[in-house]
Amino acid sequence: MADRKANGGGASASSSGTNLLFSSSATEFSFNVPFIPVTQAAASPASLLLPGEDSTDVGEEDSFLGQTSTHTSTPQTFSYFSQVSSSSDPFGNIGQSPLTTSAMSAGQSALPKPPATLAFTTGSQDALSAFPPSVSKAPGATPPSQMGTSTYSPSQPSSLPPNFGSPPQGIPQQGHNPYRHTPVSSRANPYITPPQLQQCQMPGHSSYPPPSGPPVQTYQMPPGPLPPLPTAMQSPAQQQVPARPAGPLVQGPSPFVLQNQYEPVQPHWFYCKEVEYKQLWMPFSVLDSLNLEEIYNSVQPDPESVVLGTDGGRYDVYLYDRMRKSVYWEEEPTEVRRCTWFYKGDTDSRFIPYTEEFSEKLEAEYKKAVSTNQWHRRLEFPSGETIVMHNPKVIVQFQPSSVPDEWGTTQDGQTRPRVVKRGIDDSLDEIPDGEMPQVDHLVFMVHGIGPVCDLRFRSIIECVDDFRVVSLKLLQTHFKKSVDEGKVSRVEFLPVHWHSALGGHATGVDRNIKKITLPSIGRFRHFTNETLLDVLFYNSPTYCQAIVEKVEVEINRLHSLFMSRNPNFKGKVSVAGHSLGSLILFDILSNQRDMCVSKSPGSVAVSNGVIKHSQFQEKLISEESKLMSDESCDLDVEDEEPLTLHGTLEALSLFDYISTFEKEKIDMESLLMCTVDDLKEMGIPLGPRKKIANFVKLKAAKLEQKKAAAEKKAALAALTKGQDESAPKTKEMASPSSESNESKRKLSVGAYVSSVRVDYESFEVGTGQVSVAYSSLDFEPEIFFALGSPIGMLLTIRGVARIDEKYRLPTCKGFFNIYHPLDPVAYRLEPMIAPDLDLKAVLVPHHKGRKRLHLELKESLSRMGSDLKQGFISSLKSAWQTLNEFARAHTSTTQLQEELEKVANQIKEEEEKQVVEAKKKKESPELSKDEDYLGKVGMLNGGRRIDYVLQEKPIESFNEYLFALQSHLCYWGSEDTALLLLKEIYRTMNISPEQPQH
């Protein structure tokens, strides 16, 4: 370069006004204005990608101008992966495109060529070393490779020039990027207007320095910011030359331009979640991520205590610790990351975020690459990862065991590089918009049999999460107008987990059942074991009280916690139960009292999920003791006057038969044991016999009442004693010691529930129901939703043959029994209320506003059958008319004609009746309306229908037994079920859904 500069300088000195390109003596070359070939105009994308080819062309142009250096280096084959870094900067060995030169003086005949490669490092260097005036190459030196190899080391800020990142002083910034706004490359138009013509076209600019000064070199700014030249290294002419725009014919940009456009990456926050024993990184919603980013970028007085609620307030994020913790239930804390860079391998289904520190390093290197426009770079990190940045869109990561060799192949042929991605796509469908902070309605959902809720063995928390997501989507499709108007926000669903109250693992029941379980169809047997255990536990006196108390305490705890975190909540509360959970809720709601009673001093007090039993005991003991004292007084009076045989017969006016009873050796005790047949054999007449039988019946009933009262009194005393010792005894139940295990278990169980005789509420038939002490809820539920409920079956087993039409839940207005037609656990309730009405369950509409295809096919087939029937009747009518005409023609009997006319009229009436019924079916939907039977199905749901059946899927209709078990667990992801709940909830707010928008 030094030789080129010297030659160029000599040429300029010898012929200041003549250009070497047009110094030929040929007459046909006559130009008024000389043209100067440009070595490289504004760099086009093609020229940036092929620096070696551009440098070759530049060399040819310089050779044509007589500026060829005596020491020309021959390009050699370079390696992408075997270059050795000469500096700590990973971009130091990457080849650069040659820099352009532009004429600044009108008297220059030839322009010196700038250095072929301008080193752009972040190491310790000054501005003088960044822009040397001349660069000389040693003979045989190989050009730098386009792709260098470097070990990652963070750049030192102290080594940067003070004005790094900004254009040199005195030169205004240009507002465009040369790599984006240059339409034509230097090859397409290699000429620019000479300085003389530019000076004439721009008279407003200052004059150029005189030719006697040193040659002015103005380089086109390489990609990235250039440090300013020291003032001492600049000539006075250079310090005075301002920037001037290019003329109209200039295709390239102005000499000094801005760096390439770098846009900071938009971060998004993620959290780690374990799904089916795999850790998945799930994105926060857009709203939660923006809130986290805002708090992250703000200044907090106490950053360690910053807690932000996410996921609608169900989780808290501790920003300093990067942890996400649940609010309403027990769950392991999970990690939170501020993510900007991601990777995905062959076996990964989604992009996985890098750590925040590693992402910051990648972002710094990406910024350098964009600023300097240097790509095809390989970054090696101390942990062994190797990342290659080919271009902004193609970035790959090689594992430590699969580092590619110089040919680009990996040692392990099966391992492919990971795809590296910067930022997230704005149009990513899996990122939700976020939940509104306002809650319209609160629903507590109680799980059913077993600790899992579906065939994927997921917990109630995960299933309720799916149900909540489905409800949010339906709000956007079926209540969009109300959502846009601000009338509808969202419904919050909170799970209620009670299975831990059983303590089956501690008592050894689960272990014993495992020993006797057959090894075949293991998953199905595991599911049935959990199912049978819960049903048997709930019907047992040992665990029924524990299950009921657990559900009541958990619901009150969740309600209190929700109200404390949402003090402005003005909505109502509903409850929903699945399977056995619906039966538990039904028993609890059936034994509730009015809120005025539940808020009395005797109600159950809840503080942080612990029941304060003192007031409850006082009320229970006072009420029950009063009742028992009254009964005992009556019984004591009867005991004071014991009846004898003589007294009894005198009271019944049957003393005349005393001899008969004495003859048979009958006393008062044996009299009470006599039956009607015994009295008949003794010769007692019918009248006296009836009197004695009635007396015996009444006396036996009184004795039974006395016995029941005594047992109830003893049970009450034991129950109050057990409540005083409930906390320590429960711990003993949960962890029985090996010593005298049987005796301790008996002691703890006896003190807690059933060491005394358990009272059953018995009926004429059935097993009866265990008497349980119920406490009051802290709220009045608005609606009770039963999903796949066995309430009807268990009530029938208990002995409840019929539910009174006037019966309603004391504190709950609505009740909906929702079930799938193939659910083996679900049962109806309306036949128990109105057995005389043959009503089909209400068919739940499809969430897309139509019936399923196979149901429509059934309707069309039934319609076809009715059409065939009508056709048959019409043909019969025509045949009858033909016979009538034949009879008229062959007989004159008026009586026969009247009979034929009667038959014809009857056929006509039946036909008209069928037409009317067909019209009604077309006008009204197939499903039964609530209004048609308002008040006829009892007051359990306020006079409205109770049973609602979902539409089965077409594939389920092929084999009902195959999908029976799945249908019992389908409610958590059912759009039809969620839409029915939303409709009924917002119906209480006088908000109706519009047509579905799909």
From Swiss-Prot:
It is a peripheral membrane protein. Residues 54-63 have a biased composition (Acidic residues). Residues 1-363 are annotated as: Interaction with SEC23A. Keywords: Cytoplasmic vesicle, Endoplasmic reticulum, Membrane, Phosphoprotein. Residues 79-88 have a biased composition (Low complexity). GO terms for biological process: acrosome assembly; single fertilization; spermatid development. Gene3D superfamilies: Transcription Factor, Ets-1. Interacts with SEC23A. Belongs to the PA-PLA1 family. Plays a role in the organization of endoplasmic reticulum exit sites. Specifically binds to phosphatidylinositol 3-phosphate (PI(3)P), phosphatidylinositol 4-phosphate (PI(4)P) and phosphatidylinositol 5-phosphate (PI(5)P). This is SEC23-interacting protein. The gene is Sec23ip.
